[in-house]
Amino acid sequence: MNILKFLCINCPANSYNGSGNVLKKNLFCCRFLAFLIALNILFAFLFGIAEKTRIKSGANVVNTTPSSPLPTVILDAGHGGEDGGASSADGLLEKDLNLSLALVMRDILTANGIEVILTRETDTLLYDRNVDFQGQKKRLDMAARLKIANETTNAMFVSIHMNTYPHPSCQGVQVWYSENNEASFELAKTIQSTAQELLQNENDRTVKRSGSSIYLLRKLECPAVLVECGFLSSPEETALLGDENYRQQLALTLCMGILRTIT
């Protein structure tokens, strides 16, 4: 199942609710479909130019595989287990939202031919229960996530998190990038712009360097970003994030940003 089929299955046929207002979900689907069509037209146009050039030059096609292999995308659902991360006023936990998004993203990317590794698939922190972990759970958890990335060839690391801020008016996706690999900036920029284009037209945030403030991005050498998917301090955005349909839209958007970067 490719991303277009996934989108069609998860978009209802009706376009209006009882009050006659266009449903946000359908607006997202229409916008997303239009974007995919435009992207396919662009690819077809570029392929046509390349094919004409090849024919004119008399070149023979020997190998049609990509010149460089697609990366293995590591989806890192932040927090887990005893570490709930941020929480909303009504008790929505960051760790649960992170995992929910990562699982949907895995299915979308896998359906589109991308190899995916999850740092966690359940509600747990990553530490060895057979050793003395007293007071070291978070450190061991970070080390385990780092090890997964470092042991993966041609990795691309995308960490999924939620945001919080004292002012409840703050909303929107915010992407941070590692400075250790120049491809991180392009990945972050593409995910951020895709979110703004397809889901959050009012979001005027720009990508940010992680510096030394984000442990994993500071340590990783592969392309690596951290996506703050929304503010649990915002009642309005919390309501959206708690809705499964919105999370599917958000997961699709993030995957589209990844796919635009690597394909």
Question: Can you name each region flagged by the protein language model?
Answer:
Residues 2-263:
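Catalytic-site microenvironment of enzymes
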